[in-house]
Amino acid sequence: MKKIKRDKIVGAGKISNYLLLIIMLGGGISFFIVGFLSYFKAFEHIALFSRFVNSDIRFIPQGITMIFYGTMAICLSIYIYFSIYYDIGAGYNEFNLISKKVVVFRKGFPGKNRLIKFVLPIPHLKSVKVMARGGINPKYEVFLYTKNLSRIPIGQVFKLSKLEYQASEIATFLGLAFEQYNL
């Protein structure tokens, strides 16, 4: 039987984040340019914009609003870019029966607390719990509960069936109780 189990956690470098970055940056730049050009009434002179943009866009209030939304989208895309670059949230969960410790390691933004590492003794753990909230925006999470009722998130977001399997596998490996809680 294996004595060490290590689960890799994927961070912000997912394909969905790359797509979100491209769409948000493209839309933000487009909004910013249209809003900026509305100040100069330059739509009549630029063939590219005259086909796609109504030349009746006034700088106040439409142009200013488009510049604002474009700037916000560009700022959010910069945030997403740095999240991908620094691979925020990536790490691993290591369950070691030899040393009787669980290590939860994650990466964060640069600074004093860039690397987050929890080391928990297995005897202090109480259970592995899956929390599921259904509805329009479902949320599934796996937690390690300690005996003093602190909870440490250890799971990634999967489909519920895969998440339950992962949690039950961890509970069996560590010899802990497995609980499920539906909201």
UniProtKB/Swiss-Prot annotation:
Annotated TM spans: 17-39, 59-81
The UniProt keyword set, sorted, is:
Chloroplast, Membrane, Photosynthesis, Plastid, Thylakoid, Transmembrane, Transmembrane helix
UniProt family annotation: Belongs to the Ycf4 family.
Reported function: Seems to be required for the assembly of the photosystem I complex.
- Gene giving rise to this polypeptide: ycf4
What's the protein called, per UniProt?
A: Photosystem I assembly protein Ycf4
Q: Does the keyword Transferase apply?
A: no
Instruction: Please provide the Gene Ontology terms (biological process) for this protein.
Output: photosynthesis
The primary location reported for this protein is plastid
